[in-house]
């Protein structure tokens, strides 16, 4: 964004732009300290906003009204009196900052403020961004996660943004609007920029969102009228071969900037002879909502959740204080940000995680359809035999990512039923196992499939390290569409030890597919076989005894109207009652769950919620950070105009529930 106003050397400010003699310097200073924190701060973390910097800015500006827009709160913890609990300001409101104020903000940021437009706006001739060549390129790449992660405002799954601006092949209308895409984004490369953004949003009562890569299933990085903090380029990495953590861990560790993505983390770990716990999707950001929400991984059955690996975090809180959080320093923040979800009390700038052994790893991929079996009964018997092996597979430290459905599965269409069932094992991943060991583990199930006359051809891949096995087995995922609504449930070990509950689960799988739904599931445990999980995280307790994470989804056409989306959305939410009844004391993984999950605080957070909510009130009492399913979300509502029977959608004004 270009600087549009300046101040005179004499110090007289003119927001109207009449005096154009010199621009404001970036509001930041590089911190040096006699005491070096452990681990040492990254360069981007040493560039900070301080009271001294703001005092110098105020002295030059000689305009207290403008200077106070960027000030720290009066106390070390934000008070509700600083910003009244009221609806967030929107563009067009009289309280919305003037363009010249945004220009001041951009100057203080050092030029990193971006006025955003929807990614697909180049496809619409009535938009100033119209560019047919650019549109063609965007349309071609629209389903690629790399396209959306590289844009400051776009998200991977646009349904909960409001379907505001999609390329014509995917748009149900012929229009493009800003919708719930943020109106401004700060492309942060320093802590100071995050602090400025937080101060400005808090003091001006702006809606604030945080985007790392935009992977969240429920669109946490979107918000109508919002200012976004974009952490994508916080990419620093450091290997710590003999790190001593406050919790007693002594061993190799890696410090990652919060913008480092899974593929970058895996590559770096491999280069130094290690592995790390991260997501299966290539482009997920390691230090964003993934780890904050717990973070399941292809290595979870071996080592536990991503949150379990974190030894230290650096965080900018809602009062813009930059802190270190560990098991002994700001321990309540450390607890909350490892499992309590993203968009709650602050912005993580880096995290230090355990560096794990570089394990040999085998992966297996295979498929079978009903046409590869004697018939539907044999197909579903084969699926049931997989369920029977969940416990054995998880106890061996393996992970399986599978799909079950029918090729015509779509609510409201003619359904071909049992003529097109399919089972697809995207990847059966066996860490610390050779091909022969993996074959031996799979033999009992495969022998049973052979006895059923099920045809399948397993493809084995082996590498002497996790990264090389993972990279060929987990392709970039299908994103960018608004045609899917999902719900999920974690099913515990007790379900599969009980014949009646196991049979109910097997019948539920078949019923889901016969109802036109699809299943995307994982055999997985949140308690790794190699280590005991830490006791000081806020990870949903249901993860610790889970044997499978089951996602069930409905789908519709790109051109479907809101009425079809409403019916399909409510249908899958209601259908999930089947699994909720089978495992009533379990829960759901918040990052891959139903936005309108009943009793979502219990489902996503379990017994941790009361403490999480109390910490939310302690560290963010004004509700600066908000997301639809985040801690404290029940105090707010998004007043949408979309024709849905619920207000949980990011495309609307954010207001307290009482307003």
Annotate each PLM feature:
Residues 19-659:
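Soluble FAD-dependent oxygen oxidases
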Residues 1-26:
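Fungal secretory targeting signals
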């Amino acid at each position: 964004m270009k600087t549009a106003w300046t101040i005179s050397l004499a110090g007289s400010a003119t927001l109207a732009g009449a005096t154009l003699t010199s621009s404001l310097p970036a509001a930041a200073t590089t911190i040096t300290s006699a005491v070096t924190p452990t681990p040492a701060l990254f360069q981007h973390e040493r560039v900070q906003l301080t009271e001294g910097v703001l005092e110098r800015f105020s002295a030059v500006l000689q305009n207290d009204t403008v200077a106070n827009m960027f000030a720290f709160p009066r106390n070390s913890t934000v008070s509700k009196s600083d910003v009244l609990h009221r609806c967030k300001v929107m563009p067009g409101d009289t309280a919305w900052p003037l363009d010249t104020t945004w220009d001041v903000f951009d100057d203080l940021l050092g030029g990193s403020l971006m006025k955003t437009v929807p990614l697909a706006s180049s496809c619409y001739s009535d938009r100033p961004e119209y560019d047919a060549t650019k549109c063609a390129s965007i349309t071609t790449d629209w389903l690629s996660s790399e396209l959306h992660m590289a844009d400051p405002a776009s998200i991977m799954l646009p349904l909960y943004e409001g379907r505001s601006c999609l390329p014509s092949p995917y748009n149900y209308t012929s229009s493009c609007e800003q919708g719930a895409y943020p109106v401004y984004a700060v492309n942060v490369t320093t802590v100071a920029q995050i602090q400025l953004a937080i101060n400005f949003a808090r003091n001006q009562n702006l809606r604030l969102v945080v985007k790392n890569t935009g992977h969240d299933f429920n669109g946490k990085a979107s918000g109508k009228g919002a200012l976004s903090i974009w952490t994508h380029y916080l990419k620093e990495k450091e290997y710590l071969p003999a790190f001593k953590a406050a919790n007693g861990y002594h061993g190799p560790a890696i410090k990652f900037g919060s913008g480092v993505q899974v593929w970058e983390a895996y590559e770096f770990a491999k280069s130094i002879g290690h592995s790390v716990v991260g997501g299966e999707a290539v482009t997920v950001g390691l230090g964003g909502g993934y780890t904050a929400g717990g973070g399941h991984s292809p290595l979870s059955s071996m080592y536990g959740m991503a949150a379990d690996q974190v030894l230290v975090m650096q965080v900018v809180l809602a009062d813009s204080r930059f802190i270190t959080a560990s098991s002994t320093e700001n321990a309540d923040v450390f607890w909350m940000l490892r499992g309590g979800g993203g968009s709650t009390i602050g912005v993580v700038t880096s995290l230090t995680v355990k560096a794990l052994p570089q394990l040999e790893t085998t992966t297996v991929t295979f498929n079978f359809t009903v046409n590869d079996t004697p018939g539907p009964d044999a197909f579903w018997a084969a699926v049931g035999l997989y369920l029977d092996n969940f416990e054995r597979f998880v106890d061996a430290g393996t992970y399986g990512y599978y799909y079950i459905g029918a090729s015509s599965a779509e609510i409201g269409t003619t359904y071909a039923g049992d003529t097109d069932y399919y089972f697809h094992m995207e990847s059966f991943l066996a860490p610390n196992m050779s091909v022969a060991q993996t074959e031996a583990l799979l033999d009992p199930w495969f022998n049973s499939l052979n006895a059923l006359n099920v045809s399948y051809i397993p493809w084995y891949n082996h590498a002497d390290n996790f990264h090389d096995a993972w990279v060929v087995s987990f392709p970039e995922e299908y994103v960018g569409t608004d045609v899917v609504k999902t719900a999920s449930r974690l099913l515990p070990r007790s379900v599969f030890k009980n014949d009646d509950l196991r049979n109910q689960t097997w019948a539920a799988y078949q019923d889901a597919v016969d109802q036109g739904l699809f299943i995307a599931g994982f055999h997985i445990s949140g308690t790794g076989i190699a280590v005991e999980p830490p006791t000081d995280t806020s990870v949903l307790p249901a993860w610790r005894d889970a044997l499978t994470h089951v996602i069930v989804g409905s789908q519709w056409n790109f051109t479907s109207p809101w009425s079809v989306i409403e019916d399909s959305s409510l249908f899958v939410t209601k259908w999930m009652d089947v699994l909720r009844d089978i495992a009533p004391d379990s829960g759901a993984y918040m990052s891959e769950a139903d936005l309108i999950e009943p009793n979502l605080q219990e489902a996503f957070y379990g017994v941790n919620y009361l403490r999480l909510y109390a910490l939310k009130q302690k560290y963010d009492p004004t509700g600066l950070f908000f997301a639809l399913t985040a801690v404290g979300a029940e105090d707010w509502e998004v007043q949408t105009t979309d024709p849905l029977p619920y207000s949980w959608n990011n495309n609307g004004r954010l207001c307290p529930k009482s307003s």
